[in-house]
């Protein structure tokens, strides 16, 4: 089974000026889809779609894992329920975990869980850490979000 692995912030949803997902006064993440995301992904609803996201704000106490999970469910709702699953790394770079991109942990965990053929799969992201994680996991192809979603 081939999968489409997707980064979250800056790939699927908008960032604020400090390159974070915006939050409301309660700290809830505000999920606003970037242009063309829903239109591009909707026809691919029969593919495995797996989101992998670094969310160091959890360990920094900016927001909770529950708030990130709520945001992921809101994202899936906005996309019409087409996401197969997701993995969230709550660690900071200093934690030196195996899941935080550019390491491969989140991708390989999801691949094992869903029986994914990594070589036949694609990763879409907006940063070099996404490309490096895909490469480390053995994902067959990486495409930058601006190219995949046709942003100028």
Predicted regions and their residues:
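Asp-based, Mg2+/Mn2+-dependent phosphohydrolase catalytic module
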Residues: 1-4, 66-85, 93-123, 127-152
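A short alpha-helix capping/helix-coil boundary motif
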Residues: 17-20, 52-55, 87, 108-111
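Active-site neighborhood of HAD-like aspartate-dependent phosphohydrolases
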Residues: 1-50
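Short glycine-rich loop/turn motifs that provide flexible caps or phosphate-binding loops at active sites
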Residues: 9, 56, 124
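Hydrophobic alpha-helical segments that mediate membrane insertion or helix-helix packing
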Residues: 10, 53, 133-134
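Short, flexible/disordered intra-domain loops and linkers
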Residues: 20-22, 26, 60-66, 95-98
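Substrate-recognition element of Asp-dependent hydrolases with the DxDx(T/V) motif
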Residues: 37-72, 83, 87-92
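Short, active-site-adjacent cap segments at secondary-structure transitions
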Residues: 12-13, 57-60, 93-95, 130-131
